Amino acid sequence: MFTDKETHRKPFPTWAHLLHSEPSKQFVFGNWKMNKTLTEAQTFLKSFISSDILSNPQIITGIIPPFTLLSACQQAVSDSPIFLGAQTTHEADSGAFTGEISAPMLKDIGVDFVLIGHSERRHIFHEQNPVLAEKAAAAIHSGMIPVLCIGETLEEQESGATQDILLNQLTTGLSKLPEQASFILAYEPVWAIGTGKVAHPDLVQETHAFCRKTIASLFSKDIAERTPILYGGSVKADNARSLSLCPDVNGLLVGGASLSSENFLSIIQQIDIP
């Protein structure tokens, strides 16, 4: 672990600057989930960091490794344009919570942002909206950016309940944040994650526009306009461009396709910048 964090501070724009700058920036985050050993991560980053594709200042790239790789990845990306994310956090700062990791711990090792409420956390580990609200607040208070993940199941989508589900997830999940908080939203329809099914760009745009309107009602029009809203769900190089062309899509949350540096770079290369 570094003893002098100032000497390893990334020489790139801060999160606050990125989230308050022009809205044309696109964010592309790769969620590794429960994958990669240390050796595999080192191999990935060696080829990934050296790519010229990452030189576009309008595209903000982040990787989200498992907890065991965060420190090593932080050292590897500290002098690169790549930001570091965590897959979840506990809502408490410390305590008798065996197996958990807190937001201050993540911030201490250089994590920039943290996923809150990924669909696998919601549906496999039964994380509920009120707890996710506490986790989002914990991330903010520790100096990280929460990426609140929301989405509906296939049954909910087919019954026409998508907007009701998302409204509840947004209203509760963001309820503990300060009025001027900076956060990122990720819409990931559960039926599209890891299934090969991709939401049609028209549906994605409609849903993202609804989310932005909801953020405006919960916070302000200004915050809604500057909040990046990402799409996640079977994102690949052959659909990344069409998704990024949606006016209210500000980036992509990539799952399995981000495990290969070649595939992930191909996706980033397809991102459309106005």
Swiss-Prot record:
GO cellular component entries: cytosol
Keyword Cytoplasm annotated: yes
Binding site for substrate: 31-33, 194, 234, 255-256
Catalytic activity, reaction form: D-glyceraldehyde 3-phosphate = dihydroxyacetone phosphate
Residues at the catalytic site: 118 (electrophile), 188 (proton acceptor)
Keywords: Cytoplasm, Gluconeogenesis, Glycolysis, Isomerase
PROSITE patterns assigned: TIM_1 (PS00171), TIM_2 (PS51440)
EC number(s) stated in the UniProt entry for this protein: 5.3.1.1
One Gene Ontology term of the molecular function aspect: triose-phosphate isomerase activity
Pathway membership: Carbohydrate biosynthesis; gluconeogenesis; Carbohydrate degradation; glycolysis; D-glyceraldehyde 3-phosphate from glycerone phosphate: step 1/1
Database matches in InterPro entries: Aldolase_TIM, TIM_sf, TrioseP_Isoase_bac/euk, Triosephosphate_isomerase, Triosephosphate_isomerase_AS
EC class: isomerase
Main localization, broad class: cytoplasm
Cell compartments where the protein resides: Cytoplasm
Keyword Isomerase: yes
Family indicated by similarity: Belongs to the triosephosphate isomerase family.
Function noted in UniProt: Involved in the gluconeogenesis. Catalyzes stereospecifically the conversion of dihydroxyacetone phosphate (DHAP) to D-glyceraldehyde-3-phosphate (G3P).
Subunit structure, interactors included: Homodimer.
Protein name: Triosephosphate isomerase
Organism: Chlamydia trachomatis serovar D (strain ATCC VR-885 / DSM 19411 / UW-3/Cx)
Gene from which this protein is expressed: tpiA
